[in-house]
Amino acid sequence: PSASSTDVITNDNVFQACFTDPNQGTASAQYIADNNLGTKVAVIYDSSSVYSSGIEATFVEEAQNKGLEVVAEEAFTADSKTDFSTQLQKAQSAGADLVFLPIYYTEASIILTQANGMGYEPAFFGVDGMDGILGVENFDTSLAEGVMLLTPFAADADDEKTKAFVSTFKEKYGDVPNQFAADAYDAIYVIKAAIEQAGATPDMSASDLGTALTGAMTSISVDGLTGEGMTWQATGEVSKAPKAVVIKDGAYAAM
C-alpha cells in the first residue's frame, strides 16, 4: 500500500495508494520555496534506493525552478548508512540552512543525532518515509523537534474519520499509527469501492474480476485517511495532495 516507485505501476492492473516518488520531490521543493523555509538547501539521499534517488532527482529539478540554491547533493548507499559525518560536514561547509532528507526514518534518526553532535542546526525536511521516526528504538526524540515532512497522513487531524482510526489503532496496538498504517487501511476501502463500482460478484472468474476492477479504478473517488476525493489515472497513479506536518512537543502536528 505504501509503494511509491513508478516501477510498480508498469503492469496494467496495478494501482497505487501512495503518491509517487517524483510527486514527492516536486511537492517538497514547492512547499519549501513557497513557505520560505530555506534558501540554501543540501540533500542527503540513498543512491542505492530507487525510492530515495527518485525523489532526490525531481526535488533538485523543481528546487532550481523555484529559485532555491541546492548547495550540496550528498549520497550514501545501503552499505554506508551508519556514518553521515562527511555528508553533514559538506552541507554545513556549503552554508545549507535546510537539509532535505528523502530517506527512511532509521537513517534520518542517525543523521539528526550526528548533526546534533557536531553542532549543526539547519532545518530538516523529509518525506513520507520519515513518518515513524518518533518510534525509532534508542533515539532521542527531542532531536526531532521542528523536523518537517510531507506525508499523506497526519495522526493529529481533527476529522472524525482520523480520530476514530487513531483511537482504535492505539487501543489495539498501543501506538499512534503512521502513514504506512493509514495507506494500508485506505487500500482496503479503495478495493471495496472498486468492487462496488464494478458490480463484482463471488462467481466471477479471477480474469473477469481483474478486468472489472481495473476498469472501475478510473471511475471511483474515495475519501480516505490519506486524501479526500482520491482518484486514479489509467496509468495506476493516484491523485491526492500530501499533508505538511512538523514534529512539535514529541508528536506530529499539522503545519
Regions found by a protein language model. Name each.
Residues 1-255:
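Extracytosolic ligand-binding ectodomains
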